[in-house]
Regions:
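Conserved beta-strand hairpin/beta-sheet module of binuclear metal-dependent hydrolase folds
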Residues: 41-63, 68
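General alpha-helical segment detector with a strong preference for membrane-spanning helices
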Residues: 38-39, 109
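Metallo-beta-lactamase
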Residues: 1-37, 60-65, 70-95
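Bulky hydrophobic/aromatic packing residues
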Residues: 25-27, 44, 50, 158
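Divalent metal-coordination and catalytic microenvironments
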Residues: 14, 32-35, 42, 101, ...
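Accessory terminal helices/loops
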Residues: 49, 63-158
């Protein structure tokens, strides 16, 4: 995205696990390059009723239908990037998962349903199990797509 077709000014290039503070909130950058090179997920602490929870604004972790995983000459590390992202995300202790790419994936973590339940007790957004489940189903889907593409390539070489 280039507003008015002008390049963005870059203050600094963030590395994995570096922090950014905005409006008094500190966010931790996590490199999650599977879906898109340079994709970054953001971890932050949030408070509710005198408790602190860890939230994650996750970059997308799904595989788009047109993605070539097997023997991708344009992105030879795509499978390793996805696997890195899934493993790294699984290693985080997240209470509140939030959808990827700035809310453009409301289906992630059942966010649409949770939004309709705002105000309920317990808070529907506190969902560490849903966080891990979303990682697992996306990782499984990536593995199935990779195997499907591998088989198709091998069948074409016979």
């Amino acid at each position: 995205m280039r507003p008015d077709d002008k390049p963005h000014l870059i203050d600094r290039v963030l590395q994995d696990n570096e922090t950014v503070t905005l409006g008094g909130e500190t966010l931790i950058a996590h490199r999650t390059p599977g879906h898109t090179p340079g994709c970054t997920s953001w971890e932050l602490d949030v408070e509710e009723n005198d408790r602190t929870y860890t939230a994650l604004i996750n970059c997308s972790i799904g595989v788009n239908p047109d993605y070539q995983l097997y023997q991708n000459s344009d992105r030879p590390d795509i499978v390793a990037d996805y696997r890195y992202s899934y493993g790294m995300l699984r290693s985080l202790d997240i209470d509140i998962p939030l959808g990827g790419l700035g809310g453009s994936h409301p289906g992630m973590y059942n966010l649409t349903d949770k939004y309709e339940r705002i105000g309920e007790t317990p808070n529907p957004f506190i969902d560490p199990g849903g966080y891990l489940y979303e990682i697992a189903i996306n990782e499984q889907a990536m593995g199935l797509r990779l195997e499907e593409q591998r088989r198709a390539a091998e069948a074409g070489n016979r």
